[in-house]
Design a protein with these regions (language model features):
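Cyclophilin-like peptidyl-prolyl cis-trans isomerases
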Residues: 1-164
Length: 164
């Protein structure tokens, strides 16, 4: 899918930039939430705290700014948003989707980019964008050394900006 009507998110990392086309027509609440968090600087300084080869890279947890790695992956913005599952889109390589807890309506700020087709996630996680440039950056991130919790041993911080 290439929806050129939505905003573009740029995730800047030490490995380069990941440029993402957001899909407000597919998941308006998720796009609005992501854009607001990015514009408020919420994501700046957070890390990709969970990377799993042949699956995905996950970031957007405010706790990932902390040195205590045991808190990484459990942070949120203090609220959650309702799921918006797509009937038509699939979790193919390059898709941006929202992470959540066991409740489908528990997404907040954490997101992931799939680095390999992961159709088993379809209709369970809210797709709200797709990488249009910089997938090689995601591939570099997913290949870093990590601990037993899939948390990279080196900090991979991000700065997220939005272009209309």
């Amino acid at each position: 899918m290439n929806n050129s009507s939505g905003p573009i998110a740029v995730i800047k990392t030490k490995f380069g930039d990941i440029k993402i086309q957001l899909f407000p027509d597919v998941a308006p609440g998720h796009v609005e939430n992501f854009v607001k968090l990015a514009q408020d600087g919420f994501y700046d300084g957070t890390t990709f705290h969970r990377v799993i080869p042949d699956f995905m890279i996950q970031g957007g947890d405010s706790n990932s700014k902390n040195e205590d790695r045991n808190t990484h992956g459990i942070g949120d913005p203090g609220y959650s948003i309702k799921a918006e599952f797509s009937k038509d889109l699939t979790h193919k390589r390059g898709i941006l989707s929202m992470a959540r807890g066991t409740d489908p309506n528990s997404a907040g700020s954490q997101f992931f980019i799939v680095v390999a087709d992961s159709k088993f996630l379809d209709k369970q996680y809210s797709i709200f964008g797709e990488v249009i440039e910089g997938m090689e950056v995601a591939d570099k991130i997913v290949d870093v050394k990590r601990d037993a919790k899939e948390n990279p041993l080196e900090k991979i911080t991000m700065k997220v900006t939005i272009r209309s």
